[in-house]
Amino acid sequence: MNRRVHVLLGAVAIAAGIGTVRAAQAYKGSETFDAAWTIIRDSHFDPAMNGVDWPAVKAELGPRAARAQSDGELRDVIRDMLGRLGLSHFALIPSGRDNGAAAPVDLGGDPGFDVRLAGSELLVTEVDPNGGAAAAGVRPGWRLLSIDGMPIYELLSRLPETMSDRLRHVEIWRMVETRLRGPQGSQVPLMFDDGVRGVGLVVERRAETGQPATVGNLPTMYVRVDAGERRTPRGATVGVIRFNVWMPAVDPLFQDAIDKLRTADGIIVDLRGNPGGLAAMIMGISGHFLRERTPLGTMKTRDADLRFAANPRLVNAAGQRVEPYAGPLAILVDAMTGSASECFAGGMQALGRARVFGQTSMGQALPAFFAKLPNGDVLIHATGDFVTADGTRLEGRGVVPDEAIALSRADLLSGRDATLAAALKWIDQQGR
């Protein structure tokens, strides 16, 4: 499944708590709060702190941090501080559970399906054929009703009414994911609506597949690249490449896929559910589709502007001269497409090199770094802002598809991928 710094972290940061939670540390209230406040003051890309009176925030929240009686209380104060900025990529990775329990919680087992919010319904959008959910009979389009007795409507009720739809998608995914996961080999009771009736199943959590990769203090991620061919309604051959995170292990696999698809009538890069990763990789991946060194966007920091440009890939893995792919290029995105994925999709869209299909992406496109705090927690803090070559700021906006395709339960239940179908139809039209 598609789950889960130079540097763009994206929803990889959202998934940061989805792994093994380590034993708790002493909370060190004032020292930890002051360290986090100072790091942000000194590194925020906007000296005006996005319009927030930063000293006033310290004056208000500092005493609360000093009075904190547990790690959980301290984290609540720091998260309150981070929330005042109104930006993504400011977060905490706890060194232990908020309740102070010392026993580690293993969240390395995955039930093998993914979900998205459609209105007030949480729908299964994808099922791993090798996962526990597939073995139990779960199908795309089913509505998830409860996890281990916890009703989904109760989780949704915890979201603030003022929260934007874009953030609701991200937050409910995070809340659900942390409950779906658990130790490998364990089981989780789930209730679904299959479109006709309620279905209760017990699903085994299995080990994730893919090439393990680690970044900083984040849990291990598993890199997966899938590539194959599809036929358009008119019989054209289209290559479809999908990967789940921007990590170095993707590059040789992506290049191999491109080498096999150079004669295709079109290529689709599927970034649905891809939360981001290493920002610098967008320069190399885009170079498979651009002949010249072309600006993709600019990362604006407090001290400098870092320009991202496509690095044309003119030699293949065998050392042979090649031309970047010049045919039609479609990019698929959804509500869980974040960070580096947004920079790539938005950058290629702004250049007119790709057409984007799907649902508006996360709008969480800030570059971020890690800093260890005195209590052992890790602060994720944004240090720059990214704008595409045409000046479009992706933070808080997301990549808006050229062709918006609403998530439909009827499509999912029938096995139809409407976003992919729209991209295939468009590629057909380019061959006229």
Question: Language-model segments: which ranges?
Answer:
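Conserved PDZ fold ligand-binding element
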Residues: 135-166, 241, 268-272, 356, ...
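Terminal peptide-recognition signature
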Residues: 36, 81, 113, 133, ...
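Extended, small/polar residue-biased N-terminal targeting/export presequences
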Residues: 48-120, 183-229, 431-432
